[in-house]
Amino acid sequence: MEKQAKVLDASVVVKWFSEEENSDKAINLKESYLNGEIILIIPILTKIEILNALRYKKNSEEYLKKVNEDLENLQIKIAEINNNLLDKAVEISLKYNLTIYDSIYVAIAQLYGCQLITADKELFKIPDVVDLGKI
């Protein structure tokens, strides 16, 4: 049986490093990945968003560098951001009135034919987007 791929946005991945609502569910997704049960896909943008979010939570430089290293060591599949993906993101952004940043995640999920899991309420209006709190 082929492993299911899932796109995670930064609102989910940041919960691996910061105790928040539904952090347990986010960590369960990471554990499923580490156990080889699922494939995780993120754009490189995710790492930037996570480090930025954690920076504003008053974390130290040392901690932020450790998070960056931990993310690298996980070897999560990084979706290439190319013109095809950006064109799809623009289309989604205009259709649903989203930022291009958020639309990138939706576009990746659509192009890979898999679920996007998010804790971002703004994305719940998109068909086939999964609320982290409901998994």
Which role fits each region the language model picked out?
Residues V12-V13, T46, L85, Y105, ...:
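Alpha-helix capping/helix-boundary segments
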Residues N35-E37, N73-L74, Y112:
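Structured helix-beta-strand junction loops
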Residues M1-I42, K57-E69:
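Short, well-structured N-terminal submotif of metal-dependent ribonuclease cores
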Residues K77-Q115:
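Active-site neighborhoods of divalent-metal-dependent phosphate/nucleic-acid chemistry enzymes
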Residues D9, D102, D120:
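Acidic active-site catalytic centers that drive phospho-/nucleotidyl reactions
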Residues M1-A5, A79, V106-I135:
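Acidic, PIN/NYN-like endoribonuclease modules and their adjacent C-terminal/linker elements
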